[in-house]
C-alpha cells in the first residue's frame, strides 16, 4: 500500500508539472482512469474526489489545496535533487538508474546516436518517476543526459552512447593514399563495403538493423558521422544509391540489374545522370574556388570575374541562391547572403554587411540580365523581396520548384494549385541523389536549417552555403530541363515569369502597397550618391508604384454614392 501511495504521488506531481503546477480536484480525479494509474493506486488515494482531497491535504509539503484548486509547491524548481519523494532515504528504488537504463535501451535500439529531441520523444513511454527525474523539458533533459557522463556523450543537439559498438580489427580507417577517410571518400568506402556484404548474402535480404550492425563493425564513429549514425540515417543513405540497393519491408538487397539490348546493365531509371558540364566537385579542395566578399570593392572585382566566366560559356547559365533571415517580432524578412555559381568558381556575397553590394557591385546586373539563365529553387520566396525593397526584377529564370510542379502535374494529372512545394534536399533525393554522395556536406547537416545570419563564416560553413547553387548548376538544371516535355515548355516559361513578377500578385485590394527600400537590420548603410547628393536608398526606391493617398476628412452629410465618397465593397442577397 505504501508503494502505491508513493506511485500515486509521483503521478499527480508529474501531471501538475505538465499543467503549469495548478489543476482542479475534478481534473485530477479524472486521471483515475488514465494509463499508468493502477487500481492499487486508486484504492490508496480513495476512489472519490473527497478521498483524493484528503489524500493530497495529507502531504502539505508537496501540495496546497485552496478550495477546488490543487497547487504543486515549488513546481518551478522541482527536480530530482530537492524532491523529497526521490531522496534515497525514503525511496527503495533508484529511479535515476531506471531512467538511465530506459534511455540506454532506447539508444541501443534506435541509435546508438540520435537527436536529443528524438530521444526525448520516447520519454512518454516511460514510468512517471522516470519522466520526473529526467526533466520535464528539452533543456532539463539535456542537463540530465550531460550529468550521466558514464553512459551518454552529448554533442550539440545529438546524444550517443558512450559504450557504443566499435569496429573490429578489420576496421577501415584510411583511404588509398594513407589519409583518414572523410567526406566523399568515406561515403564511397561505405557503399563498397555494404555492397560486398550483400553480395555475400545474395540469396536472402538482410534486415536493416542487422545491416547497420555490420556497418558499425567495419567503420569507426568518426566515419559513421559522415554516412549514418543510426539505422534510420543508413536507410536514407541507401536510398541515395537506389541504383545499387533495394529496400522493402526494412530489408536490404542488391538491385537485380537488367541487360539492355546493347548489352549494358541498367539498374535504376531515375537520378542516374552524371555530372556532364565539367563543374568541379564540392569537397574540401573546392574551397580555393569559393570566394567570400563583404565589401563593395571586392564584390565588384568578383562580379567582373564571374562575368568573364559567363561570357566564355556557350550557353550562359549560373546557379543562384539567396539566403534570408527573419528579424523582429513581426517576422520581417531580409536578405543575408547571395550566391552565384559558374562552372569554375562560386561567389558568396554578404548582403547583410552592406546594402549597396546588391545594387552597385553588378550583382543586380546579373539578376536582371536577359542573356543569362539563373537557375534557382523556389524564386517566389525572394522575388517579392528583391522587387519591393531593392527595385530588382529577375529575368530569364529557371525555377526548379516550378519544373517539379509541372512534372508532377504531368505524371499524376493534378492541378498545379494542389501541388505542394518541395524542399531542396528532397529535390536532390528525387532527381539527383548523387549530388549528396559527391559532396562533403553530410545528409545530416543538409537536412537541418542553418541560421544564415551567423557571423563569422567559417570555411566549413561556406561549403554548406554554396551547396544549393552548386547542385542547381552542376546537375539539376540539365536533368530537369531534359525531363520537361516539349508541350509544357511554354507553360513552364510563363509560370517562371509569373513567380518573378510580384507586381502582378499585388494587384489585389487585400494586399498592401509595396514598401520602399529599407536598409539592412544588421548594419545601416552610410554610402551616399556623391553626384546627386542624395541617399542611395532614394535613388533605388521603386518608382513604378504610386504612394497610397492620405485619407481626408469629409462632412457626413455630403458623402453620397454619386460623389464617390461611399463605395460598395460587397452586396449580399437573402
From Swiss-Prot:
Residue ranges of every copy of the 3'-5' exonuclease domain listed in the record: 312-414
Main location: nucleus
Start-end of Acidic residues biased regions: 262-273
UniProt-annotated stretches for the region Disordered: 259-278
Pfam families: DNA_pol_A_exo1 (PF01612), WH_Egal (PF23713)
Disruption-associated phenotype: RNAi-mediated knockdown results in animals that are viable. However, animals display a small, but significant, defect in nuclear migrations in hyp7 hypodermal precursor cells where an average of 3%, and up to 21% in a single animal, of nuclei fail to migrate.
Classification via SMART domains: 35EXOc
Name of the protein in question: Egalitarian protein homolog
Biological source species: Caenorhabditis elegans
Amino acid at each position: 500500500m505504501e508503494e502505491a501511495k508513493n506511485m500515486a504521488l509521483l503521478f499527480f506531481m508529474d501531471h501538475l508539472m505538465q499543467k503549469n503546477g495548478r489543476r482542479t480536484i475534478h481534473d485530477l480525479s479524472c486521471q483515475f482512469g488514465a494509463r499508468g494509474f493502477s487500481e492499487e493506486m486508486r484504492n490508496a488515494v480513495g476512489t472519490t474526489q473527497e478521498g483524493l482531497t484528503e489524500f493530497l491535504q495529507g502531504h502539505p509539503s508537496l501540495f496546497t489545496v485552496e478550495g477546488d484548486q490543487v497547487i504543486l509547491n515549488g513546481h518551478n524548481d522541482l527536480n530530482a535533487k530537492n524532491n523529497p519523494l526521490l531522496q534515497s532515504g525514503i525511496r527503495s528504488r533508484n529511479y535515476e538508474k531506471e531512467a538511465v537504463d530506459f534511455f540506454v535501451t532506447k539508444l541501443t535500439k534506435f541509435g546508438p546516436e540520435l537527436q536529443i529531441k528524438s530521444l526525448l520523444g520516447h520519454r512518454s513511454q516511460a514510468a512517471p518517476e522516470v519522466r520526473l527525474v529526467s526533466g520535464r523539458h528539452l533543456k532539463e533533459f539535456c542537463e540530465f543526459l550531460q550529468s550521466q557522463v558514464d553512459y551518454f556523450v552529448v554533442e550539440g543537439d545529438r546524444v550517443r552512447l558512450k559504450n557504443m559498438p566499435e569496429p573490429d580489427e578489420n576496421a577501415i580507417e584510411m583511404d588509398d593514399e594513407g589519409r583518414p577517410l572523410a567526406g566523399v571518400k568515406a561515403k564511397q568506402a561505405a557503399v563498397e563495403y555494404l555492397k560486398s556484404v550483400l553480395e555475400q548474402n545474395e540469396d536472402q535480404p538482410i534486415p536493416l538493423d542487422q545491416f547497420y550492425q555490420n556497418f558499425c563493425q567495419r567503420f569507426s564513429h568518426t566515419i559513421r558521422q559522415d554516412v549514418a549514425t543510426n539505422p534510420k540515417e543508413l536507410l536514407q543513405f541507401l536510398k541515395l544509391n537506389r541504383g545499387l540497393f533495394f529496400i522493402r519491408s526494412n530489408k536490404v538487397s542488391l538491385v537485380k540489374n537488367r541487360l539492355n539490348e546493347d548489352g549494358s546493365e541498367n539498374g535504376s531509371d531515375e537520378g542516374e545522370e552524371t555530372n556532364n558540364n565539367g563543374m568541379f566537385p564540392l569537397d574540401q579542395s573546392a574551397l580555393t574556388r569559393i570566394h567570400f566578399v563583404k565589401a563593395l570593392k571586392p564584390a565588384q572585382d568578383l562580379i567582373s570575374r564571374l562575368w568573364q566566366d559567363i561570357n566564355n560559356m556557350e550557353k550562359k547559365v549560373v546557379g543562384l541562391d539567396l539566403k534570408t533571415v527573419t528579424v523582429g517580432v513581426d517576422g520581417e524578412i531580409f536578405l543575408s547572403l547571395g550566391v552565384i555559381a559558374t562552372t569554375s568558381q562560386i561567389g558568396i556575397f554578404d548582403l547583410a554587411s552592406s546594402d549597396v553590394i546588391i545594387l552597385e557591385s553588378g550583382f543586380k546586373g546579373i539578376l536582371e540580365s536577359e542573356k543569362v539563365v539563373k537557375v534557382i529553387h523556389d524564386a517566389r520566396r525572394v522575388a517579392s523581396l528583391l522587387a519591393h525593397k531593392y527595385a530588382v526584377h529577375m529575368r530569364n529564370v529557371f525555377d526548379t520548384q516550378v519544373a517539379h510542379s509541372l512534372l508532377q502535374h504531368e505524371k499524376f494529372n493534378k492541378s498545379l494549385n494542389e501541388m505542394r512545394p518541395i524542399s531542396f534536399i528532397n529535390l536532390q533525393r528525387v532527381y539527383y541523389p548523387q549530388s549528396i554522395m559527391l559532396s562533403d556536406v553530410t545528409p545530416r547537416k543538409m537536412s537541418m536549417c542553418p541560421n544564415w545570419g551567423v557571423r563569422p563564416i567559417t570555411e566549413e560553413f561556406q561549403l554548406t552555403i554554396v551547396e544549393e547553387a552548386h547542385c542547381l548548376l552542376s546537375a539539376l538544371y540539365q536533368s530537369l530541363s531534359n525531363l520537361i516535355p516539349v508541350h509544357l515548355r511554354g507553360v513552364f516559361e510563363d509560370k517562371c515569369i509569373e513567380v518573378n513578377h510580384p507586381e502582378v500578385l499585388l494587384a489585389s485590394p487585400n494586399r498592401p502597397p509595396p514598401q520602399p527600400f529599407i536598409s539592412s537590420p544588421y548594419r545601416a548603410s552610410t554610402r551616399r550618391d556623391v553626384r546627386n547628393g542624395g541617399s542611395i536608398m532614394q535613388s533605388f526606391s521603386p518608382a513604378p508604384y504610386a504612394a497610397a493617398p492620405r485619407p481626408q476628412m469629409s462632412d457626413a452629410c455630403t458623402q453620397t454614392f454619386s460623389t464617390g465618397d461611399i463605395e460598395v465593397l460587397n452586396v449580399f442577397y437573402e
